[in-house]
Regions:
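Short beta->alpha transition motifs characteristic of CBS
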Residues: 64-71
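Short Gly/Ser/Thr- and charged-rich N-terminal loops/segments
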Residues: 6-11, 16-19, 85
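Short hydrophobic alpha-helical segments enriched in small aliphatic residues
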Residues: 21-25
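Zinc-dependent deaminase
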Residues: 28-48, 96, 109-177
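Short beta-strand scaffold segments in enzyme catalytic cores
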Residues: 53-58
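A short, polar/charged loop-to-alpha-helix boundary motif
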Residues: 73-83
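Immediate flanking context of iron-sulfur cluster ligation sites
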Residues: 95-107
């Protein structure tokens, strides 16, 4: 497992084309439009009174699943954006193995979601914001580098820090009024 953050040991550059904005980290290519879709999902969660986290799963340049948190509405602790997106993607592909898929999420995954990502064989995780909990960071790294499952996961963190922090701060301000 490799963990990349802008400004750390890698040159980061944005290339604007007429259709998309691409984000280069070494040889890894991230398309901004998918992260934008994850933020659209996060906004849906916000409007429903859910913690605003969104997830988008992409395979071969096509969106195959989108989801947002619905934990409160469903009264189910596992209904995180990443889990729901994985369920939708697996159903669409008729396979629990999501080989060749990438996931775009607005916040670094919790350990439960990281385990599901690893088990699903998702290759790249693009996270808008790193979870500030140091225990979470340690656990996530251990999950992604574990050889108990024959898959390798690359984690790209802190790609849209300000946008994600603002969304989360606004949500928690609104629920504490």
């Amino acid at each position: 497992m490799e963990v990349f953050e802008p400004g750390q040991d890698r040159k980061v550059a944005a290339l604007r084309t007429s259709f998309h904005v691409h984000f280069f980290v070494g040889v890894i290519l991230m398309d901004y439009k998918y992260m934008d879709l994850a933020f659209v999902e996060a906004e849906k969660a916000f409007k429903k009174g859910e913690v605003p986290i969104g997830a988008v799963i992409v395979k071969d340049g096509k969106v195959i699943a989108k989801a947002h948190n619905v934990k409160e509405k469903s009264n189910c602790a596992v209904n995180h954006a990443e889990i729901l997106a994985i369920l939708k993607a697996s159903k669409k592909l008729r396979n629990w193995r999501l080989d060749g898929c990438d996931i775009y999420i607005t916040l670094e995954p919790c350990p439960m979601c990281a385990s599901a990502i690893k088990q699903s064989r998702i290759k790249n995780v693009y996270s808008a914001l790193k979870n500030k909990d140091k225990n979470n960071e340690t656990i996530i790294k251990e999950i992604f580098k574990s050889d108990m499952v024959n898959s390798s996961v690359n984690l790209f963190n802190n790609l849209f820090v300000e946008k994600s922090e603002t969304l989360l701060q606004n949500f928690f301000i609104s629920v504490r009024k």
